[in-house]
Swiss-Prot record:
This is Histidinol dehydrogenase. Its cofactor is Zn(2+). The keyword Transmembrane helix does not apply. It comes from Prochlorococcus marinus (strain SARG / CCMP1375 / SS120). Keywords: Amino-acid biosynthesis, Histidine biosynthesis, Metal-binding, NAD, Oxidoreductase, Zinc. Pfam families: Histidinol_dh.
């Protein structure tokens, strides 16, 4: 096989595989972030101090136009929907309906339980008042991201959703993105992007309201801005470049595996496409099939860059070894193209989303399966989850002790308070337990 056709590096050493997977996971290095973080901080400070004036200046600097007016009118949003072809309207509506139906299962329930001494203990859930959603834009269009961010907020009961998205070269937002916003019921839309948009949502400007939670993916500057404003507002996650890991055995279809790897690679030169397989012959065929598909691929250059830099095939001794490597990488998307995928789920501990079998390519989840496509990246699936209804909600603990419950537990509470040297904590219990019982 020629070097040209070995577009994906193929290895069979498990230790080398671990090293390479770690390198891929860390592809947005701390050094790169440190180089950008001072610029992001300056942008945020300017927006905080100058508001709309900063947004106009920064957008002219980075995007080449002054976004006056900032806000998209309801008439423009309606017009975008009406000019959307009927098949695409129907696809957007179907996606919205399925995402909404799935996320309704996630609505957390309030509860109030009686403790052993008659005390009442519980938890109440409530939505945030305002949510900001960031939709990547410019030369690209992601209507699915509008639905995946807005619908969970709607299901949560958020009162007001504010959408920001960078305009294209003509200063306009993509029509399909606006159409998605229309069916999601978003009333406030602003044609602003980058770190300055995150600053506007965090601090508020003369035109853009301050929000309580910000969700949505973006480039490095957007991600760093979200990181810096966290604490001022809530955020969904710090999204990195997208990734797929496919586990395939003898039953996998070569064309399907190759296409699914390319479906990830076409996103971005930093996207990672990884195949773990027990079949060395499959690995060879995959490289050939990828080369064949790239001959007329419209994003061939991006795919080649992505696969060359961040693609990998690992030949594993058995399926259990595949699971171990996958868990160490904690992929954003995990496809199980194996004979009995359901029997394998128990071995998977770390993954943003799992796609089981040949009829469940990642694209089903990207668009309209129902579960959210905003998933943890860069190994963060070890400890974090997909965007959900709870992203836009917060819980409040409910505590109602009666006199008997306080008296029964007072000695232990005072002991703990005194151990921490907190006199008034202890006294707040003592003065109550010495009070005559209401039964006396």
């Amino acid at each position: 096989m020629s070097e040209r056709k070995q577009i994906l590096n193929c290895i069979d050493d498990p230790q080398q595989a671990l090293i390479m997977l770690k390198r891929i996971s860390a592809r947005t290095s701390l050094e790169v972030q440190e180089n950008a973080i001072s610029s992001v901080q300056n942008i945020l400070t300017e927006v905080k101090q100058l508001g709309d004036e900063a947004l106009f200046r920064l957008t002219e600097k980075f995007d080449g136009f002054i976004p006056k007016p900032l806000e998209i009118t309801p008439e423009q949003t309606l017009e975008a929907w009406e000019k959307t072809p009927t098949p695409l309207q129907e696809a957007l509506q179907l996606a919205k309906n399925r995402i909404e139906a799935f996320h309704k299962y996630q609505i957390p329930k309030d509860f109030l339980k009686e403790g052993i001494h008659g005390e009442l203990l519980g938890k109440n859930w409530s939505p945030v008042e305002k949510a900001g959603i960031y939709i990547p834009g410019g030369r690209a269009a992601y209507p699915s991201t509008v639905l995946m961010n807005a619908v969970p907020a709607l299901v949560a009961g958020v009162n007001e959703i504010i959408m920001v998205s960078p305009a294209g070269p003509n200063g306009q937002l993509n029509r399909t993105v606006l159409a998605a916003a229309y069916i999601a019921g978003i009333k406030k839309i602003f044609r602003i992007g980058g770190a300055q948009a995150i600053g506007a949502l965090s601090y508020g400007t003369q035109t853009i309201p301050r929000v309580d939670v910000i969700s949505g993916p973006g480039n490095l500057y957007v991600t760093l801005a979200k990181k810096l404003v966290y604490g001022q507002v809530g955020i969904d996650s710090l999204a990195g470049p997208s990734e797929v890991l496919i586990i395939a055995d003898h039953s996998a279809d070569v064309e399907q595996v190759a296409t699914d790897l390319l479906a990830q690679a076409e996103h971005d030169p930093l996207a990672a496409s990884i195949l773990l397989t027990t079949e060395s012959n499959l690995a060879k065929k995959i490289n050939l099939e990828i080369e064949n598909q790239l001959k007329d691929h419209p994003r061939s250059a991006i795919c080649r860059k992505s696969l060359k830099d961040w693609g990998l095939i690992v030949i594993c001794k058995d399926i259990k070894s595949c699971a171990a490597l996958s868990n160490s990488f904690a992929p954003e998307h995990l496809e199980l193209l194996i004979e009995k995928p359901f029997e394998f789920i128990s071995q998977i501990k770390n993954a943003g989303a799992i796609f089981l079998g040949e009829w469940s390519p990642e694209a089903t989840g990207d668009y309209l399966a129902g579960p959210n496509h905003t998933l943890p990246t860069s190994g963060t699936a070890r400890f974090s989850s997909a965007l959900s209804v709870e992203t836009f909600m917060k819980s409040t603990s409910i505590i109602n002790f009666n006199q008997a419950a306080l008296n029964k537990t007072s000695a232990a509470i005072m002991e703990l308070a005194n151990s921490e040297g907190l006199h008034s904590h202890s006294r707040s219990i003592e003065i109550r337990r010495s009070k005559p019982s209401s039964d006396d």
